């Protein structure tokens, strides 16, 4: 399940945010972060982890949005015929992703180079033990022969999310003499152990009908995820593409690492 297109952007955002407050090497990085040597992956991983905790509220002066929560906007989802027993049209509005900054574990980060004559290719391994998407929902569908037409609050809990990320970024030299990066491509491969849906106001909160319906929905998690996952992943990618591009517009890559 490719939910965490978001995750791949966040780590790269975090790493580049080390210099977001002070680009000049003589001024140092905003506490508690520090510049790393190019090949020191353990330092890069440590600083990426620190970033999530230190800047979960974003960096307003750089127009970097908050990491807790992450605004995903509105998603329109329609069942794709994966199950005859469940058919629906679902709108998720004011959607937000929670617990990414609090639970992110960066397991590997490779591909940094000083060669600015060709595209940078990064590979990342990311783990999140638990993520949560919350939104307002509006659904029109059916479960078996039971119609489901409802509005309310939706929560999707995602457990043990493991993501591999590939990012390609093009170095661009500007008139100021510095080189900046522009993302040209990204790919993800994500596995998730399981998930859980919770919807308020089903059948006007008739407890018996609500509980039995949610039980069936959660038993069909894998089927539902085939339709819900791509839309969430698309929303995450859009949100973090904007974050990365706005940040990279002000941060020269050629001043990123500690001098050797």
UniProtKB/Swiss-Prot annotation:
Keyword Cell inner membrane on entry: no
Keywords, comma-separated and alphabetical: Biological rhythms, Signal
Residue spans crossing the bilayer: none
Keyword check for Signal: yes
Induction context: Expression is under the control of a thermosensitive enhancer element called dmpi8 that is encoded in an intron of the close-by circadian clock gene per. At lower temperatures, splicing efficiency of dmpi8 is increased resulting in an increase in the expression of dyw.
Pfam families: JHBP
Gene Ontology BP terms: circadian rhythm; positive regulation of circadian sleep/wake cycle, wakefulness
Knockout or disruption consequences: RNAi-mediated knockdown in per-expressing cells increases daytime sleep levels whereas night-time sleep levels are relatively unaffected.
Signal peptide as annotated in the record: 1-25
UniProt tissue specificity: Epidermis of newly eclosed adults.
InterPro entries to which the protein is assigned, alphabetical: Haemolymph_juvenile_hormone-bd, To_sf
One of the record's GO cellular component terms: extracellular space
Similarity comment text for this entry: Belongs to the TO family.
Other observations noted: Named 'daywake' based upon its function in daytime sleep suppression.
Function of the molecule: Component of the circadian clock or downstream effector of clock function. Required for suppressing daytime sleep (siesta) under ambient environmental temperatures. Part of a heat avoidance mechanism that modulates daytime sleep behavior under different environmental temperatures to minimize the risk of heat exposure. Under cooler ambient temperatures, suppresses daytime sleep (siesta) and thus allows for longer periods of daytime activity.
Name of the protein in its database record: Circadian clock-controlled protein daywake
Annotated organism of origin: Drosophila melanogaster
């Amino acid at each position: 399940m490719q939910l965490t297109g978001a995750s791949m952007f966040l780590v790269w955002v975090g790493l580049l945010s080390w210099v977001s407050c002070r680009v000049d090497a003589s001024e140092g990085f905003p506490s508690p972060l520090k510049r790393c040597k190019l090949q020191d992956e353990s330092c890069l991983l440590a600083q990426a982890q620190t970033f999530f905790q230190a800047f979960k509220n974003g960096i307003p002066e750089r127009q970097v949005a908050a990491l807790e929560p992450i605004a995903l906007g509105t998603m329109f989802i329609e069942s794709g015929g994966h199950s005859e027993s469940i058919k629906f049209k679902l709108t998720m509005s004011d959607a937000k992703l929670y617990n990414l900054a609090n639970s992110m574990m960066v397991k590997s980060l490779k591909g940094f180079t000083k060669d600015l004559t060709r595209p940078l290719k990064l590979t990342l391994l990311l783990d999140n033990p638990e993520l949560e998407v919350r939104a307002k929902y509006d659904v029109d569908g059916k479960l078996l022969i039971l119609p489901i037409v409802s509005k309310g609050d939706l929560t999707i809990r995602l457990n043990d999310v493991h993501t591999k990320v590939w990012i390609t970024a093009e170095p661009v030299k500007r008139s100021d003499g510095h080189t900046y990066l522009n993302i040209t491509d990204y790919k993800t491969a994500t596995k998730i152990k399981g998930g859980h849906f919770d919807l308020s106001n089903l059948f006007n909160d008739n407890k018996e009908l609500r509980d039995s319906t949610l039980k069936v929905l959660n038993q069909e998690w894998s089927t539902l995820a085939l339709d819900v996952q791509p839309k969430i992943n698309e929303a995450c990618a859009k949100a973090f593409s904007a974050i990365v591009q706005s940040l990279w517009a002000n941060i020269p890559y050629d001043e990123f690492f500690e001098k050797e």
